[in-house]
């Protein structure tokens, strides 16, 4: 599978994994290893080396070839997100930052105005900026223009498991973007991840669907296989849709010859 390029980094895996909601750090680490992912996102509050039970930085740092992408989850404004990004870079040493600004805890929809403000500043400061956004083609283009390394439109609401309810808007974003489009949030099943890749996404980010599965490691592996299958299918060339049936083995000439 071709490499995913984000900023100056390349990744052979196109599955990005979130690290929240797992029943234990051990379960999360097993899922990360099973998935083969090379990029995981971690909330700033989980960088806590003084309290081992809350710290994810240490265990994740032990996985060879894994890059950490801190996120600004919990930020309600651009100012808070920028502050969180600075702290995260100092603690992790990672140039990546996933900008998440969702001020309303009831629906967790990303704030487009505050997100744009934060991304403009962080990109200028040299971060590899990956914003979580509504499936808005205009916003996605504006974020690309200020220097974001990718755009991450939601498939549906965070943790909802409602799948690719924004598929038509995501398709427009893909057509108009010059940076990788990565579906983030709402995916429930590996088949939805496969569909996202088939439609043209460069990667998918999954968290809840893996974390709350009966067997997170097995589900992580299933998502990894689905992402690869979707990417390979797209490159192979999906057959066009037809409004009517098209016979695969026409028998007209054969039947005529036997009369």
From Swiss-Prot:
Q: Quick one: which pathway? A: Cofactor biosynthesis; thiamine diphosphate biosynthesis
Residue spans crossing the bilayer: none
Instruction: Give the principal location in a single coarse category.
Output: cytoplasm
Annotated active site = 98 (schiff-base intermediate with dxp)
GO BP, one example? thiamine diphosphate biosynthetic process
Keywords (A to Z) from UniProt: Cytoplasm, Schiff base, Thiamine biosynthesis, Transferase
Q: Where in the cell is it found?
A: Cytoplasm
What Enzyme Commission number(s) does the record list for this chain?
A: 2.8.1.10
- The positions annotated for binding 1-deoxy-D-xylulose 5-phosphate are 159, 185-186, 207-208
Q: How does it assemble?
A: Homotetramer. Forms heterodimers with either ThiH or ThiS.
Family, per the entry?
Answer: Belongs to the ThiG family.
Q: What is this protein called?
A: Thiazole synthase
Q: Which organism is it from?
A: Chlorobaculum tepidum (strain ATCC 49652 / DSM 12025 / NBRC 103806 / TLS)
């Amino acid at each position: 599978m071709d490499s995913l390029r984000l900023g100056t980094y390349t990744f052979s895996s196109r599955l990005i994994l979130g690290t929240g909601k797992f029943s234990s750090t051990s379960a999360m680490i097993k899922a990360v290893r099973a998935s083969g992912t090379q990029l995981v996102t971690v909330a700033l509050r989980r960088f806590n080396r003084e309290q081992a039970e809350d710290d994810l930085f240490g265990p994740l740092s032990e996985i060879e070839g894994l890059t950490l992408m801190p996120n600004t989850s919990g930020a309600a404004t651009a100012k808070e997100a920028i502050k969180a990004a600075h702290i995260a870079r100092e603690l992790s040493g990672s140039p990546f930052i996933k900008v998440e600004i969702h001020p309303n805890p009831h629906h967790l929809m990303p704030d487009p105005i505050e997100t744009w403000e934060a991304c403009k500043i962080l990109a200028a400061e040299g971060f590899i900026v990956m914003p979580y956004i509504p499936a808005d083609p205009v916003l996605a283009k504006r974020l690309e223009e200020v220097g974001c390394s990718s755009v991450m439109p939601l498939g549906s609401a965070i943790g909802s498991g409602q799948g690719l309810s924004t598929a038509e808007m995501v398709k427009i974003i893909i057509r108009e973007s010059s940076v990788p489009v990565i579906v983030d949030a709402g995916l429930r099943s590996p088949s939805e991840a496969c569909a996202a890749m088939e439609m043209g996404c460069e990667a998918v980010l999954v968290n809840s669907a893996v974390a709350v599965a009966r067997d997170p490691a097995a589900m992580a592996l299933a998502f990894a296989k689905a992402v690869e299958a979707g990417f390979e299918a797209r490159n192979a060339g999906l057959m066009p849709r037809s409004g009517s049936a098209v016979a695969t083995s026409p028998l007209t000439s054969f039947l005529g010859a036997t009369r």
